[in-house]
């Protein structure tokens, strides 16, 4: 039994090291050897658990996806209407930018890689669908949303909200104007309400 625990710890250590390397240097700038060296394991151990960089990144993505879904759900579950849902989402993205930019950078890198790697594209599509569904489900608590939707489905509205906040967050994290960085997220909140 101790052997299984030890193997799980090695696998988890590799995964956490990969998350750290990928979120600080990006997919294109990290090799399996970099991850093995930083994790303090032999390259053969890393390939035993994860076979190749794509499979390892896929596992890192799974961890990231679980974290995003859980945090967004936790942020908006207490909202009483669509306005509070949107305010909670804006607050989530602000906190993500300020407190956990590595997670956002990893999400951005994942999005870029998904353009070229089919397995990442499938995962990202699944993540966006899950996030859209969470937002949509929470928007439906507000019956006023259907009166303001101008004939668009709640799913389309949820996709617009997610796209606006994710895209604006990318601009903020890449931007140099830190003084007024969050004005655009505040504006998105005002426009979406």
Predicted segments, located by residue:
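N-terminal intrinsically disordered/low-complexity leader segments
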Residues: 1-9
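Hydrophobic/aromatic-rich alpha-helical bundle segments in the mid-to-C-terminal region
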Residues: 3, 121-125, 143-192
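Residues in soluble alpha-helical coiled-coils and helical-bundle/repeat scaffolds
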Residues: 5, 51-55, 66, 77-81, ...
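Helix-turn-helix
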Residues: 13, 17, 21-55, 59
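Solvent-exposed, amphipathic alpha-helical segments
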Residues: 13, 17-24, 71, 75-78, ...
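Hydrophobic alpha-helical connector segments
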Residues: 59, 73-103, 154-161
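Short, basic, alpha-helical segments at the C-terminal edge of helix-turn-helix-like DNA-binding modules
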Residues: 62-68
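Amphipathic alpha-helical packing segments from all-alpha helical-bundle domains
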Residues: 74, 99-105, 118-144, 156-159, ...
């Amino acid at each position: 039994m101790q052997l299984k625990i030890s193997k799980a710890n090695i696998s988890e250590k590799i995964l956490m090291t990969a998350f750290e390397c990928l979120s600080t240097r990006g997919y294109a700038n990290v090799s399996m050897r970099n991850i093995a060296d930083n994790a303090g394991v032999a390259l053969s151990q890393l390939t035993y658990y994860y076979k190749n960089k794509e499979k390892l990144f896929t596992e890192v993505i799974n961890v990231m996806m679980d974290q995003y879904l859980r945090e967004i759900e936790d942020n908006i579950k207490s909202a009483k209407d669509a306005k509070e849902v949107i305010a909670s989402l804006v607050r989530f993205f602000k906190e993500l930018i300020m407190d956990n930019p590595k997670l956002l950078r990893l999400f951005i890198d994942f999005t870029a890689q998904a353009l070229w790697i089919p397995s990442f594209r499938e995962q990202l599509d699944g993540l966006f669908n899950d996030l859209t569904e969470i937002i949509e489900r929470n928007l439906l608590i507000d019956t006023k949303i259907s009166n303001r939707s101008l004939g668009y489905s709640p799913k389309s509205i949820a996709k617009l909200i997610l796209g606006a906040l994710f895209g604006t967050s990318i601009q903020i994290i890449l931007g140099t104007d830190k003084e007024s960085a969050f004005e655009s997220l505040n504006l998105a909140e005002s426009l979406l309400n």
